[in-house]
Amino acid sequence: MVKIAHIHMSGCTGCLISLTDTYEKLLDILGSVELVYALTLTGEKTEITETDDKILIERDIPGGIDIALVEGSVCLDDHHSMDDILTTRKNSKKSLVALGACAASGGVTRFRRVGQMSQPSHASFVPIGDVIKVDLALPGCPPSTESIVKLLTAALEGDMEYLEPFAEIAKYGKDACGCDVIKEVINKSLCMGCGTCAAACQVNAIDMVEAKPNINSEFCIKCGICSAQCPRVRFPEIIRKLE
């Protein structure tokens, strides 16, 4: 039986909530796999040490994981986070999935400049691909329930044709947060005005003005959905290869 684990890093748990919102479809998936680790869902064994200034949580991440779903970014200031993400990569035999914007491209955690209570020393966050090799990345804040189910189903069935775009997104990490749409498409006049980015944006940060996208930086949360949906975001790279 396929072993699946959900590893929670620095995130809001929104991606896991999106996964559990699938209800019957989630039950179908869980009926065909073995959920070996999911701290939030199953209350896995942890060792908690509390001191005057911090709370330390030691997680027992099992080995032999077939599909690891990693939610949240990595805190570079926390050696426990670093240990957990390295252990997850070592214990994942097949696919490691960056689930959601924080894991895939850094998301809103990249806006952090100083630490906050209750962990004031935690100030530096990066997407997990900056630390380990990521096989698949599913952007969104959070990803839609349907997209999570389809990705998991394809991974279980070994549908590499369906998974290929997610493997491609995983290669770009923080560059695929939506900034690449501005830099590689809009600024280079490659946009064809299809409006797919505006339709996909989860926070309505993109307006179509005279058939061209106008991105409101005050609303944008760097979720990467527009990058994943844009049909021309990789055109400049293809052109460079041809040249």
Curated annotation (Swiss-Prot):
The keyword Cytoplasm does not apply. GO terms for molecular function: 4 iron, 4 sulfur cluster binding; coenzyme F420 hydrogenase activity; flavin adenine dinucleotide binding; nickel cation binding. InterPro entries: 4Fe4S_Fe-S-bd, 4Fe4S_Fe_S_CS, Coenz_F420_hydrogenase_gsu, Hydrogenase_assoc-protein, NADH_UbQ_OxRdtase-like_20kDa, NiFe_Hase_small_N_sf. It is an enzyme of class 1 (oxidoreductase). [4Fe-4S] cluster 2 binds at residues 201, 220, 223, 226. It holds the Pfam family Fer4_10. The keyword Electron transport applies. Residues 182-210, 211-241 form the 4Fe-4S ferredoxin-type domain. PROSITE patterns: 4FE4S_FER_1, 4FE4S_FER_2. Its EC number is 1.12.98.1. Belongs to the FrhG family. Reduces the physiological low-potential two-electron acceptor coenzyme F420, and the artificial one-electron acceptor methylviologen. This is Coenzyme F420 hydrogenase subunit gamma. The gene is frhG.
